[in-house]
A protein has these predicted regions:
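An interfacial alpha-helical scaffold signature
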Residues: 1-148
Length: 148
C-alpha cells in the first residue's frame, strides 16, 4: 500500500505559499516517493497471492493520460497521471475499478524523455492537488538531481 502523507503535506504547503523553497521541498520529497500510475491491461491480468499482476507477452499495457484543456495554446497535449495514494486514485476514478502500477519520478522521466514520447509531462493528483510537471520541468529536476 502506498501512503505519501509527507508528499501530500508538501503539496498543500506549496499550494498555500508557492515559492521556490516550497517547490523544492515538494520536489525533494517527490524524488523519494512511490506513486500510483493508472493503467489499462488488455486482456485483463490475473494476480498472484501478493496482489502482483501476472503478465505475459500477450498483455498490452496502456497508461492513462489527461489533457489540459485550459492550455489554449496546446489543448491536444496529453499528460501521464500519478497519484500519491489509493484515495486520490479512487477520487479521480469516480468509483470505477482502476488498475495501477507503482512508479517513481524516474519511471515518469524515462517515459517522457524517449525520442518518440507523445505525452508532454505528468500530473500528480489531478482530482486533488493537481501539480503539473511538464517535460521541461522534469528535465530541470533531473539536472538539479544530477548536479549538472
Amino acid at each position: 500500500m502506498i501512503i505519501n502523507e509527507e508528499l501530500k503535506t508538501a503539496i498543500k504547503m506549496m499550494a498555500q505559499d508557492n515559492n521556490s523553497k516550497s517547490q523544492n521541498d515538494m520536489i525533494d520529497i517527490l524524488m523519494k516517493s512511490k506513486l500510483l500510475i493508472p493503467v489499462k491491461i488488455s486482456p485483463a491480468a490475473k494476480r498472484d497471492d501478493q496482489g502482483n499482476y501476472i503478465l505475459s507477452p500477450k498483455h498490452k499495457i496502456t497508461f492513462a493520460t489527461v489533457k489540459n484543456y485550459q492550455d489554449t495554446k496546446n489543448p491536444d497535449w496529453s499528460y501521464f497521471i500519478g497519484f500519491t495514494d489509493s484515495e486520490e486514485l479512487k477520487a479521480w476514478a469516480n468509483g470505477k475499478k482502476v488498475d495501477a502500477f507503482m512508479a517513481d519520478f524516474n519511471d515518469y522521466a524515462v517515459m517522457l524523455l524517449k525520442p518518440d514520447a507523445v505525452c508532454k509531462g505528468f500530473v500528480l493528483n489531478p482530482a486533488g492537488g493537481n501539480v503539473c510537471f511538464p517535460t521541461d520541468v522534469v528535465k530541470q529536476i533531473i539536472k538539479r538531481r544530477d548536479g549538472k
